[in-house]
Curated annotation (Swiss-Prot):
Residues 249-274 are annotated as: zUBD/ZHA. This is Zinc finger-containing ubiquitin peptidase 1. Changing E428A: Loss of catalytic activity. It is found in: Cytoplasm; Nucleus. InterPro entries: UfSP1/2_DUB_cat, Zinc_finger/UBP_domain, Znf_C2H2_type. The keyword Cell cycle does not apply. The motif interacting with ubiquitin (MIU) and ZUFSP ubiquitin-binding domain (zUBD, also called ZUFSP helical arm ZHA) are responsible for binding the distal (outgoing) ubiquitin units S1 and S2 respectively. C2H2-type zinc finger 4 is a ubiquitin-binding zinc finger (UBZ) and required for polyubiquitin binding, possibly binding the proximal ubiqutin, and for catalytic activity. C2H2-type zinc fingers 1-3 are required for localization to sites of DNA damage.
Amino acid sequence: MLSCNICGETVTSEPDMKAHLIVHMESEIICPFCKLSGVNYDEMCFHIETAHFEQNTLERNFERINTVQYGTSDNKKDNTLQCGMEVNSSILSGCASNHPKNSAQNLTKDSTLKHEGFYSENLTESRKFLKSREKQSSLTEIKGSVYETTYSPPECPFCGKIEEHSEDMETHVKTKHANLLDIPLEDCDQPLYDCPMCGLICTNYHILQEHVDLHLEENSFQQGMDRVQCSGDLQLAHQLQQEEDRKRRSEESRQEIEEFQKLQRQYGLDNSGGYKQQQLRNMEIEVNRGRMPPSEFHRRKADMMESLALGFDDGKTKTSGIIEALHRYYQNAATDVRRVWLSSVVDHFHSSLGDKGWGCGYRNFQMLLSSLLQNDAYNDCLKGMLIPCIPKIQSMIEDAWKEGFDPQGASQLNNRLQGTKAWIGACEVYILLTSLRVKCHIVDFHKSTGPLGTHPRLFEWILNYYSSEGEGSPKVVCTSKPPIYLQHQGHSRTVIGIEEKKNRTLCLLILDPGCPSREMQKLLKQDIEASSLKQLRKSMGNLKHKQYQILAVEGALSLEEKLARRQASQVFTAEKIP
């Protein structure tokens, strides 16, 4: 009896089979499960094995390897039709069979891993079997008028072994792969083993172990991929960090350059010219805006050039007679003031178009020098001297550096002041006065000594500096003490006296070089209004900068004292309070 591989019909002889096959060749092949048509036999077999694996398995019971030989008594060798091994797809049911009742329940639930009826205990054997099924179409070879093919020896669907005869192959499968062909019955006591990783049920412990090993290999591969991914992530993170660091350094470098240029502009070291260039530039702006006639521009320019050539201040920013006016005011008014101490006579100098924004230190030096020039105690060291203009003051400070005073400060300013808008502070005024043999010293109030950032110790020091008489002294004391140079961050002013209120609070009297002449002229009126003194009076609450420095003049120096102070200025120090 011969069985058709296409439809399963059984015929009795080879001629009937050939005729039956011709019918299949002439008719359209239709899938018995989904009615697919229009494909050849090999494609239909592949379609059924892949798309209808479960249905095909449930519909047919397990069939053993079929080997059919056809032969005649006359010529058995030439007329042999070998329908090579057909391993029904249901053979996969025997690879590692689940319990029947479990397979029936899970048929519609789990098609991803267990394959509902594909109860394989050995994934490796299953893969080999699928390969053998792909080859099956080429292994089935029929000699005759229908197919002109050659005989191909049978191959084991599980391990790939090739035998010469089908009987040998059947024996091989039964002996070597008997465990894969066993189908556990519903009521048998065969032990079942669950995969701890995917839940697959196996009937053989060794097959389960191999199955689990496949899981472990897969996990190991995934871990390796994770490590590669992790290594790539670390490298990417390192590259991103390097790029971020590079951008940060570039940004810091850019900000540093900008800050340095800002400081250069702030302290007048940006090579934009000095007093002369700024004066001319600002006067040109005034002319362009219509605030200054061209004739006035040329007149002022000529006066400036003459002043610079002589090295003396032209006096156009000076206001004299302030101490005298204050003395009259306190004698006749100021009923809330208990006592007041005033410095020696001093002139006020305010900033001009040539030094606006940076010349406060120079103007305060002019105020202090104006007081010293009117004090007989300093005639010897300042004999024949006039108030210098700002470029001349810069030249005098450079000369003091050349003598050896304060080399560190000179280095910070590149040993150059002329032609720049560089600020000067208490240190530069100190070395200039010392080079002129004027005795002075600097006191550094480096932190606040009172509540809310105030400096009561500063007020006490200035009071002690000016006061020298007891309770019996008059209300207004005009001392012979020169004004005090007062420096803080970004600005400097001149202290010309101190008030003591009836409630014992203290108030400094301060001249500001930023105050224009028209405001100072209000103090020279016969009847000074109390509001006019508002620009001079500074209470403790008005002085809240973090640090203050004062420079106080104490007399004249001998030549030996000057040399000693020059040597001491190599490492500049100041008295600190507290």
